[in-house]
Amino acid sequence: MLIIDNITILRQTIKQWRKSIQSIALIPTMGNLHDGHMTIVNQGRSHTNIVIVSIFVNPMQFDREEDLFLYPRTLQSDYEKLHKIGVDAVFVPSVETMYRDNINCHTFLDVPNLSSILEGIYRPNHFRGVATIISKLFNLVQPNVVYFGEKDFQQLVLIRQMVRDMNYDIEIIAVPTVRANDGLALSSRNSYLTPEQRKIAPKLYQVMQTLVTNLCSGEKNIDVLLNKAAKQLSKFGFTPEILEIRDAITLQPITINSKKVVVLFSAWLGKARLIDNTQVSIPKE
């Protein structure tokens, strides 16, 4: 497994690979890898010739310096996991490599209709940072296919639109959310939970599933469903932030033409901000 931190070497390596292989997969990450990441990497390993994993804690997508500083960094452990699974290369650039000048003066990419709604309300510059770094990685690696987890659903929808808008010849493949046995979506930020909070955390998924059950049973009043879910989460000790039901393709409010919707939850539990989602096909009358 190659460990590459230099753009020139990355490009030279990919140029050599392109002479003899058909497909290159990219899996962008911020490190602190868990079983959810490994599931995504395995998908790439099973379906492409070359798998490149990027590990970069991107300062442009953090709104608070404290969060950037505290984000878990476990490079050696990450390398061991990726080597064991058969990854071909890990790209681990420094901030100076990816943003040669002052980051505040750097060119950025924005997807305005998606970056300012839902998560974007609470994290104003987050998706600008995501779109910019993913675009840079696309340009550097020039992959045939890129894998993203469905847990960060708004990010997935945004990247798909960015690919369409910027005419990238790249296939985006979504990998279903990986969960612990009790239903909690795996996340690097779960490490912020205390042992007691970790016992409570699965309630987020349970409350969401109750809402989904009622929705599929024909409940039409979405406000009633969301208000009930918010009260349940508050009762368990969460501070709800986003409780929404949106069109799964556009993330806009659902209409009679929406074929599939997505239930989106985010809530604070102590110092951990937990997010989750479930896609639902609405039964037609």
Swiss-Prot record:
UniProt keyword terms in alphabetical order: ATP-binding, Cytoplasm, Ligase, Nucleotide-binding, Pantothenate biosynthesis
UniProt key word GTP-binding: no
Gene transcribed to yield this protein: panC
Designated name of the protein: Pantothenate synthetase
The reaction(s) this protein catalyses: (R)-pantoate + beta-alanine + ATP = (R)-pantothenate + AMP + diphosphate + H(+)
Recorded GO MF terms: ATP binding; pantoate-beta-alanine ligase activity
Subcellular location: Cytoplasm
GO biological process: pantothenate biosynthetic process
Pathway connected to this protein: Cofactor biosynthesis; (R)-pantothenate biosynthesis; (R)-pantothenate from (R)-pantoate and beta-alanine: step 1/1
